């Protein structure tokens, strides 16, 4: 496929970070220095507008300020940064700074694009929303000190204002016809009502106040607990109640009936923008759709071979029905499912030295998806650490166990834990020579492409020996291939939700529950699902090129090192770096 770089404007003279025009040709060293100054300015600004990094109890905004004035000012500043970035002669930067420029520019551009397309009108997807994002807020506080509790309480006290600002933008979306579709909102109110509790002490927001980790005296500790109960009962829970009422009586009834984002104002342009953002290529939706159909046909043929291998007498649909309904393929308790996932992860741990030179220092755990979001959540997901004293976590959805087949658990675990997301993200965080905006970056085409490639690596690590598990691997690969078809189908080509679900049902062994939740995810998050297969196919193609050109000089551990050593990068940057590695290796022979 043809790859595209984010647009760059080349000039012999550049703007300084203060936008003063330079009057002379700059040396490479001074250009790198000036670029670094600019990126430092961008990073400083990001910190200034991020309320979660604030530790001052007197700060006015400890949760995001989403007023129209503030969002407009932030967008203006980002456009300013883009002008400064585009004024730099990228060819004059060091090779590493050229990558830095590409990545930070894409990050800033994405924020500008989201604002331009009014993404803030829809602060929710079928899986989560601003109301559930607060569950993670607890991580950013030091509860070994009284000040940590006080800061947390101050943040909680701002929940009503934060909710009202989001609701105001949702009302703007209702006026503009830019809402989530009604189809994906059925039952969504349960994720809101989960926070509305009569017993304050059962609230997850009260959890930090169950243990006196700051070792305060009894009077101080009891005073903090009383304050927490007051903030929750008078501010937080009423905010959730107000949102619940707005959602059920105003928002959902007014939500659009059409599921495709292309039916919304400027929707086709928005989808094309999201497709480019999530794949980091210039592939059109039409080309992506066709690629998906080709991959579906290829994978289907491999699945048919396994059906023959196990001696099943019946059609593909009958075999899938057998997998979906036979009790032998399902755990009977959450503990059993978690233990199976943990065992698979531990088996893969032992194979990692054969595949990688460097392993991350940060450990990971296996845990259930939080109950408040589990009903509409995907099968599993990786939740990265936010602080140095935390582990990463591979979340396994234990809700509706009869919809969580064991035959896909090897593929799921390798994707979310190791060698997939945990290994890649944890290693990325340890690349100390990279600036923070790259260590903390997550480019979906790279990260999800690596996750899907990691499922494939299980073949080389001795997994999928059971034919049903291998069928599970293929159904997960088919799942990602089908995404290319149904995501573009719904958002660009007028497919109905039922047609998309039928395509998924007919071509994968995913449970019907998963088919529904996944289809709704694609509807509510346009374009993101395209990244997996595009990224995986790129990594596989680069590996094949390296194996062919290097012959007996090919080293799988070195290849993986080259894939991961630059962190999360756009696919065209990855291709440039792998080609450089191949050429350098050949030159040394």
Model features per residue range: what roles?
Residues 2-13:
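Bacterial N-terminal signal peptides that target proteins for export
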Residues 11-22:
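Bacterial N-terminal signal peptides
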Residues 24-589:
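N-terminal maturation segment of proteins
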């Amino acid at each position: 496929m043809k790859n595209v770089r984010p647009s760059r404007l080349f000039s012999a003279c550049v703007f300084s970070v203060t936008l003063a025009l330079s009057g002379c040709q700059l040396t490479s060293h001074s250009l790198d220095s000036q670029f670094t100054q600019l990126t430092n300015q961008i990073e400083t600004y990001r910190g200034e507008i991020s309320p979660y990094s604030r530790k001052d109890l007197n700060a006015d905004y400890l949760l995001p300020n989403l007023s129209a004035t503030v969002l407009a000012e932030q967008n203006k500043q980002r456009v300013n940064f883009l002008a400064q970035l585009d004024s730099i002669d990228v060819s004059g930067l060091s090779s590493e700074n050229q990558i830095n420029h590409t990545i930070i520019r894409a990050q800033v551009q994405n924020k500008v694009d989201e604002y331009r397309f009014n993404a803030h009108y829809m602060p929710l997807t079928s899986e989560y929303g601003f109301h559930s994002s607060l569950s993670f807020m607890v991580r950013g506080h030091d509860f070994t000190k009284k000040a940590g509790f006080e800061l947390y309480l101050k943040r909680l006290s701002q929940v009503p204002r934060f909710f009202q600002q989001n609701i105001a933008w949702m009302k703007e979306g209702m006026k503009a016809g830019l809402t989530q579709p009604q189809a994906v909102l059925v039952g969504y109110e349960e994720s809101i009502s989960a926070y509305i509790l009569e017993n304050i002490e059962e609230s997850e927001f009260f959890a930090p106040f169950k243990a006196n980790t700051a070792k305060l005296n009894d009077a101080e500790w009891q005073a903090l607990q009383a304050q927490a109960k007051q903030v929750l009962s008078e501010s937080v829970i009423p905010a959730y109640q107000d949102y619940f009422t707005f959602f059920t009586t105003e928002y959902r009834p007014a939500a659009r009936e059409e599921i495709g984002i292309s039916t919304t104002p400027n929707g086709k342009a928005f989808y094309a923008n999201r497709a480019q953002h999530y794949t980091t290529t210039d592939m059109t939706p039409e080309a992506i759709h066709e690629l998906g159909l080709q991959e579906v046909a290829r994978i289907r043929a491999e699945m048919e071979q396994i059906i023959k291998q196990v001696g099943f007498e019946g059609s593909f649909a009958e075999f899938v029905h057998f997998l979906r309904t036979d009790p032998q393929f399902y755990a009977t308790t959450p503990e059993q499912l978690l233990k199976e996932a943990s065992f698979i992860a531990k088996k893969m741990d032992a194979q990692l030295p054969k595949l990688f030179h460097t392993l991350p220092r940060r450990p990971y755990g296996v845990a259930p998806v939080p109950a408040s979001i589990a009903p509409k959540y995907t099968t599993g997901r990786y939740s990265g650490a936010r602080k140095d004293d935390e582990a990463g976590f591979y979340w396994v959805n234990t809700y509706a166990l009869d919809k969580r087949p064991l035959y896909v658990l090897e593929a799921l675990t390798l994707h979310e834990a190791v060698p997939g997301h945990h290994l890649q993200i944890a290693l990325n965080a340890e690349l100390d020579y990279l600036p923070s905006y790259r260590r903390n970056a997550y480019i979906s085409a790279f990260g999800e492409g690596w996750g899907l490639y990691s499922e494939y690596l299980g073949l080389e690590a001795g997994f999928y020996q059971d034919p049903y598990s291998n069928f599970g691997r293929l159904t997960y690969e088919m799942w990602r291939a089908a995404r290319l078809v149904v995501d573009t189908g719904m958002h660009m080509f007028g497919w109905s939700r039922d047609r998309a679900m039928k395509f998924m049902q007919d071509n994968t062994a995913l449970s019907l529950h998963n088919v529904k939740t996944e289809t709704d995810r694609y509807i509510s998050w346009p374009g993101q699902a395209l990244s997996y297969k595009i990224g995986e196919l790129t990594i596989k193609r680069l590996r094949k090129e390296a194996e062919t050109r290097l012959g007996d000089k090919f080293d799988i551990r070195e290849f993986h090192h080259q894939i991961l050593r630059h962190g999360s990068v756009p696919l065209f940057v990855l291709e440039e770096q792998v080609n450089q590695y191949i050429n350098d290796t050949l030159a040394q022979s």
